[in-house]
Amino acid sequence: SGLSLRVFGVLLTSFFENVTLNRSGSAINRKFDFSSLKDLGVTFYENESSIILDGKLNAGTVNINKLDSSQILTGLLITLPFLNDNSIIKCKDLVSKPYIDITLSLLDDLGIQIKNNNYKEFVVEGNQELKRNKVIVEGDWSSAAFHLVGAAISGSITINGLNLKSLQGDKEILSVLKKCGAELKIKNNSVTVIKN
């Protein structure tokens, strides 16, 4: 997936000086822009079948622009705390803030501290270590939304394992369904939608 290529692409450059990511399927036609990594010592090339990242990722200051996608930022937020020095990520026109909130929340749960200056700058201390190594992965609101909408149109469904306090933006499907007249029953981490 695009997320995997972007996040793992960044992560792998912290371990290896030369990384080649082979792409197939829909990834062949997608744009992948790793050019912001040049600020941290990594150059980027791509052709139809591969993304090539040359150079080992260094700590430092990096500028992320809107074209880079929030997924590159996610990769940097996950990777930079483990490098030897401190880093600063400067962002312009950040997209997909809920996904960044999810990343920051997960890292915080694991004991990784990152200072968020209103999504314009992230200050990352280097040499951090995980305080925990177990995570409970919450249900995916994006995937659940399709089924919840289908039930609102044609019947009923109950989906378990959805975190009602989730930072996932697609959790908003509940308010949309309510406005559309669907009957909702919410109990613990269980959501039932009934056609009304």
Predicted feature residues:
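Short, structured segments at the rim of ligand-binding sites
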Residues: 1-196
